[in-house]
């Protein structure tokens, strides 16, 4: 018989920096899960990633106080800001342009995001990334 699922916990945790402080500690503690066990497992799973990049994670909590977790790819907005070299998006995205993204940079981001996107092919994924960039006030070249 399969384990009974008691809930899902969705968090964004910096790669390699999981610790028992909020938001991780309280979220896992409410379900009675071992916080340090998650932190060690998450940090081990993200050790090959760039430290500090936010990683969305979905933790499945079971009735016997055990858990599993699945990691998603880093949010597209974070990757776009990093590639464009800006700190945050424009306050007026369609009038004030704050950066520029080339087709090659968008293809690299789309390659990273491909497992989480619903795009059928690379060109559709690049168009999705281009749309996100435009809505942040970043100029898009060749899309």
From Swiss-Prot:
Recorded hits in SMART domains, A to Z, give: RL11 (SM00649)
Q: Which Gene3D superfamilies match?
A: Ribosomal protein L11, C-terminal domain (1.10.10.250), Ribosomal protein L11/L12, N-terminal domain (3.30.1550.10)
Q: Which InterPro entries match?
A: Ribosomal_uL11 (IPR000911), Ribosomal_uL11_bac-typ (IPR006519), Ribosomal_uL11_C (IPR020783), Ribosomal_uL11_C_sf (IPR036769), Ribosomal_uL11_CS (IPR020785), Ribosomal_uL11_N (IPR020784), Ribosomal_uL11_N_sf (IPR036796)
Q: Name one GO molecular function term.
A: large ribosomal subunit rRNA binding
Q: Name one Pfam family in it.
A: Ribosomal_L11
One GO cellular component term of this record is: cytosolic large ribosomal subunit
UniProtKB keywords:
Methylation, Ribonucleoprotein, Ribosomal protein, RNA-binding, rRNA-binding
Name a single GO biological process.
translation
PTM summary: One or more lysine residues are methylated.
Per the entry, what this protein does is: Forms part of the ribosomal stalk which helps the ribosome interact with GTP-bound translation factors.
The family annotation for this protein states: Belongs to the universal ribosomal protein uL11 family.
The subunit field of the Swiss-Prot or TrEMBL record says: Part of the ribosomal stalk of the 50S ribosomal subunit. Interacts with L10 and the large rRNA to form the base of the stalk. L10 forms an elongated spine to which L12 dimers bind in a sequential fashion forming a multimeric L10(L12)X complex.
What PANTHER family does the record tag this protein with?
A: 60S RIBOSOMAL PROTEIN L12, LARGE RIBOSOMAL SUBUNIT PROTEIN UL11M
Q: What is this protein called?
A: Large ribosomal subunit protein uL11
Q: Which organism is it from?
A: Nitrosospira multiformis (strain ATCC 25196 / NCIMB 11849 / C 71)
